[in-house]
């Protein structure tokens, strides 16, 4: 009996040792799996946080621009270009008023947005933007009446460091203003216009406000066109030039122009 008891005790000890080893191995495996799960979870969290940070930067960048837009206006168009020749892309914002009384019926009995437009110019700097010039109401609405034709279309662009504001009126020609940053504002330094009948140029005007000289070119063959089409010229365009010396005046500031539609030069 004593011998049997000893054998039983030995077997119980062996079983306990084996069970302990299995539990230890299982514990190691569980720990490894838990650590792997935690690591994977941290990677997912890190990725989400990174994406969130990027979205935050995008929003912050947009906020730096829109912070310059006054209450009661919305962004109509954004144009980029180096306007102070420092190698950085500056920002031109065309804004539009959002007044409720600006919505009216046109001649076709259709409700259109006649709110006026303006311009904000921002210079790009290392830590954001700096206001260079602003004029909140100098442009008419894009939905003005165009008579038998559509309303003139405003084009804004940067060329060789200068700001160009061009009104295109299809077959009737265009007129364009050239501004250059000087001192603390954008100054009007040039003006061009063409007067067309379809492809036929009737006349051209070019003014250099720096030199105070105006050039008026008149097509002396303007009356020679195809009578059936009232458009196609039958003779080459030949221009007669008249040079006009303008009175010396201070350059016009972009920020001080009340209405481009009423701007006249003498």
Sequence positions of predicted segments:
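Bacterial N-terminal signal peptides that target proteins for export
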Residues: 1-9
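C-terminal motif of bacterial Sec signal peptides marking the signal peptidase cleavage site
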Residues: 18-20
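Beta-propeller blade repeat segments, especially FG-GAP/WD-type strand-to-loop junctions
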Residues: 102-136, 179-181
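Primarily EF-hand calcium-binding motifs
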Residues: 73-78
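Charged, amphipathic alpha-helical segments
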Residues: 89-107
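Blade-edge motifs of beta-propeller repeat domains
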Residues: 34, 38-71, 127-148
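Acidic, small-residue rich beta-repeat scaffolds with periodic aromatic anchors
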Residues: 22-35, 42-45, 153-266
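Acidic/hydrophobic-patterned starts of short beta strands in beta-sheet-rich repeat architectures
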Residues: 83-95, 157-167
């Amino acid at each position: 009996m004593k011998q049997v008891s000893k054998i039983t005790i030995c077997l119980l000890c062996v079983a306990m040792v084996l069970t302990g080893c299995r539990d230890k191995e299982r514990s190691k495996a569980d720990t490894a799996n838990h650590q792997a799960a935690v690591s994977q979870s941290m990677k997912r969290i890190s990725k989400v946080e990174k994406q969130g940070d990027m979205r935050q930067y995008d929003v912050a960048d947009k906020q730096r621009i829109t912070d310059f837009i006054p209450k009661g206006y919305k962004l109509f168009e954004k144009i980029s270009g180096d306007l102070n020749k420092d190698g950085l892309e500056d920002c031109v914002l065309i804004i539009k008023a959002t007044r409720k009384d600006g919505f009216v019926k046109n001649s076709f009995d259709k409700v259109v947005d006649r709110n006026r437009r303006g311009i904000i110019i921002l210079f790009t700097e290392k830590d954001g933007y700096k206001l260079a010039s602003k004029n909140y109401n100098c442009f008419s609405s894009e939905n003005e009446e165009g008579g038998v034709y559509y309303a003139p279309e405003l084009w804004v662009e940067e060329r060789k460091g200068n700001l160009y504001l061009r009104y295109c009126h299809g077959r009737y020609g265009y007129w364009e203003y050239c501004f250059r940053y000087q001192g603390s504002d954008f100054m009007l330094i040039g003006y061009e216009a063409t007067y067309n009948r379809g492809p036929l140029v009737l006349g051209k005007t070019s003014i250099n406000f720096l030199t105070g000289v105006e050039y008026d070119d008149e097509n002396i063959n303007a009356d020679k066109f195809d009578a059936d089409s009232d458009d196609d010229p039958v003779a080459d365009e030949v221009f007669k030039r008249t040079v006009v010396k303008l009175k010396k005046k201070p350059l016009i500031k972009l920020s001080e122009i009340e209405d481009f539609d009423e701007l006249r030069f003498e």
